[in-house]
Curated annotation (Swiss-Prot):
May interact with TSPO. Transmembrane segments: none annotated. Residues 67-280 form the START domain. It comes from Equus caballus. This is Steroidogenic acute regulatory protein, mitochondrial. GO terms for biological process: cholesterol metabolic process; intracellular cholesterol transport; regulation of steroid biosynthetic process; steroid biosynthetic process.
Length: 285
């Protein structure tokens, strides 16, 4: 209902949003009324995806007094749509096939999703509290290049409100130069619903960051990471990472599958080392 209310007031796509002058205040009022009507509640352990998907909204956090520009509203909506679509993919348990299984229990699954393509799903358990992962993956996002060798640099280009950012990511070349230099411009949003945190995003356009010479501009499809405390062990975290990506260029599917599944496995290993080697800050998701 909330998303429908926003679409009615603010337009349902980037092209429409550009033409909605004078409607931002109307959208904010309508969304505010809808948020006031909703009763808060936390997700159960068995239905966390459904709960997050149901409660997530374009302005699910408390509305701020400052009204957003048309462009900013378009980015916020795009981030919300990426989150909803990614959670919908995770919610469907059918058709997943194992790509990679590690001795420590980490595993990568994959499936082909209509209108999206092949997606990869990493499932791991991390011996750290959820707030610690959130701090590293969101608050310290720009430091990822320090501990993840698959990432050269992540830069926040624009921050919109509390939940949404536009980022530029420069990926490192893969081992053996199987995949050359790629970069990504993405809209990302982070939300918490009860005991679950969701970090989502997808490719977007940002005029101040055009394509770079010698680097192929790849694109993230609807992507997300879901964090929630492990059942019975609140000091540990279950991390699920849905990866949807178009590397562009002429690459055999076998190479793409190998690179992406290994990238997820490597990410989990590097993240654990980072969390173990760096001090735990006081953070809240």
């Amino acid at each position: 209902m909330l998303l429908a209310t926003f679409k009615l007031c603010a337009g349902s796509s980037y092209r429409h949003v550009r033409n909605m002058k004078g409607l931002r205040h109307q959208a904010a009022l309508a969304i505010g009324q809808e948020l006031n009507w909703r009763a808060p509640g936390g997700p159960t352990q068995s239905g966390w995806i459904n709960q997050v998907r149901r409660q997530s909204s374009l302005l699910g956090s408390q509305l701020e007094d400052t009204l957003y520009s048309d462009q900013e509203l378009a980015y916020i909506q795009q981030g919300e749509e990426a989150m909803q679509k990614a959670l919908g993919i995770l919610r469907n348990q059918e058709g997943w096939k194992e790509e990679n299984q590690q001795a420590n229990g980490d595993k990568v699954l994959s499936k082909v999703v209509p209108d999206v393509g092949k997606v990869f799903r990493l499932e791991v358990e991390v011996d750290q509290p959820m707030e610690r992962l959130y701090e590293e993956l969101v608050e310290r996002m720009e430091a990822m290049g320090e501990w993840n060798p698959n990432v050269k640099e992540i830069k926040v280009l624009q921050k919109i409100g509390k939940d949404t950012v536009i980022t530029h990511e420069l990926a490192a070349e893969s081992a053996g130069n199987l995949v050359g230099p790629r970069d990504f411009v993405s809209v990302r949003c982070a939300k918490r619903r009860g005991s679950t945190c969701v970090l989502a995003g997808m490719a977007t356009q940002f005029e101040e960051m055009p394509e770079q010479k010698g680097v192929i501009r790849a694109e993230h499809g609807p992507t997300c990471m879901v964090l929630h405390p492990l059942a019975g062990s609140p000091s540990k975290t279950k991390l699920t990472w849905l990866l949807s990506i178009d590397l562009k260029g002429w690459l055999p599917k076998t190479i793409i599958n190998q690179v992406l599944s290994q990238t997820q496995v490597d990410f989990a290993n590097h993240l654990r080392k980072r969390l173990e080697s760096s001090p735990a800050p006081e953070a809240r998701c």
